[in-house]
Amino acid sequence: GDRYNATTFNGFALPSEDPEYKNISLDFFGTDIIQSVGVNKAFNAGGSSDVGGATIDIVSKELIGSGNLGFGISGGLNTQTVAADFLKQDGVNFMGFANRTEPADENSWNFRNKLDPSTQHFQINRSYSISGGKRFYVGKDKNPLSFFLTAGHTTDYQYTDEIIRNTTTSGTVYKDMNGKKYAENISQLALANVDFDMQNRHHISYNLMMIHANTQSVGDYNGKNSIFSDDYENLGFTRRQQTNDNMLIVNQLMTNWGLTKSLSLDAGASYNMVKGYEPDRRINNLTKAEDGYTLLRGNSQQRYFSTLDEDDLNVKAGLVYRLKDNIEEISNVRFGYTGRFVDDNFKATEYNLTVGHVSTIPSLDDFSLDDYYNQENFASDWFKIQKNLDEYTVKKNIHSAYAEATYQFTPRWIVNLGMKYDKVDIEVDYNVNRGGSKGNNTIQKDYFLPSLNLKYNLNDKNSLRLGVSKTYTLPQAKEISPYRYVGVNFNSQGNPNLKPSDHYNLDLKWDFNPTPTELISLTAFYKLIKNPISRIEVASAGGYLSYENIADKATVAGVEVEIRKSLFVRPVSNAAHGMNKLSLGLNGSYIYTNAKMPLATVTTGSQLEGAAPWIVNFDLSHNFTKGERSFVNTLVLNYVSDK
């Protein structure tokens, strides 16, 4: 799952655009953004250590050739939304930027956004993109200097029928509701690259990437909830309007210096900023009454504003000394330093709109919350505003030193051996849950992480690989703060006493390349996880999910098969650089996970959270190229079993 993977961008750690997750959504990275994507499931000393499943490295696109300019436009229709009366909340503009203005105080009604959603008709999914670049030659040595820029905008609509059902630990159903959810997703992405080569020995590159992603939704839910009046079988209505407005800005400076014919220096820095906003979340609950519905009293009418600011600085410097092996000349010795310094600052303001004057709403088909919640009724004491503040900070500092050697002893044998030392310091300070949870905690760990990777070439087309390594998984910021987040179908709360997990990894892989562009691969893997982290349901009157080290250890084992096959490749007539190609890809895996939890009723253990036993991906791609023009059409099928 998300917890055990790591995503890097040009070799630097990349945070998610959504603070809810560890890894960024790969949906942002189309062919106009990426040069290549590498997936590594065997780990070495120079790579990421906070990983247990796979490291996904995205290499950003650079200019190819002397220059180019391209445009793109696309549209689509969702049959569930195109002709529907689509509910859209107030406060988000065409570009997806939300109005984040909070009231100056709680002594008057001065919220900027309306409570009543509007109705929109004829929703069309759409996207636009533009890209271009130019190459220049500088100085008497004609050193190449290139610029590349791409940007895009996407809007799409979704409609979902939802069932929300919650039970207590004893099995009693306390929530059973059916809902309709209307969601609009708006995003923009921009990538700029400047690349400079000096005398074919030194290289400097700068990348700027900005991602803005807004998801806004209106959900209407009817049914049973224990918070509703028991005079009418706990029946009622809930409307939840939520916006998640997130921004990720990435700045990268990368350099490579050829010091001698055998010695080079790689150095660089990356500064990432994440702004995660949930502005003016609106929750309203109406309980069933004799003549219709009434607004529920207590803390059941809320407006909520939260902000998460994350600053993420990454630095690295490494020396590479190339060794003579008189075979493929791939042997080398590497040693260096990497550092990652992350500051998370979270603040949330909750406004409880306590009901004083109860008025009856005859029908849910036509009602207005703005007719009740306004300045006139506030001045008449129909309701009061109570303000609550929550905040926490998490600081994470990781210093790493590594050394590794790669040597090709014979045309068949290649060995990579490495050692990495990580010093991890994490500190969390919190004052949350209306002052009910105050405190701080620290995680301080020293990791010695050995790795060994062997490759044996059976012949020109077959090879065997063996990987043995130790890695770890750190808790996310939200998982070690006891702030309780209120979701539509569950509440979740962090655990400041959570400990990191240690991973011991073993991978054995067979590769068969019938042709240079085709592949058949079979992998068997085993992992031992100490102190595995999982999300669990806490036995309490409130009923919420939290994070725990659920066992002393867990085991993971499985097999994976991958096939890349060219069905046909034909030249295009009357084209010097033409190709008509049809290819297919298949990737499938089976994963067995087991953790034996103390005091569990099932003594045989249970599978880890988020681990799907069966995963299958299939694609059929047609690529037509003629000169500088190309057309790619791909059919993709995915299957993921129940987790």
Mark where each language-model region is:
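Short loop/turn motifs that connect adjacent beta-strands in outer-membrane beta-barrel proteins
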Residues: 63-68, 137-145, 200-201, 260-264, ...
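Transmembrane beta-strands of outer-membrane beta-barrel pores
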Residues: 75-79, 151-157, 210-214, 271-277, ...
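Signature of Gram-negative outer-membrane beta-barrel scaffolds
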Residues: 302, 306, 322, 328-459, ...
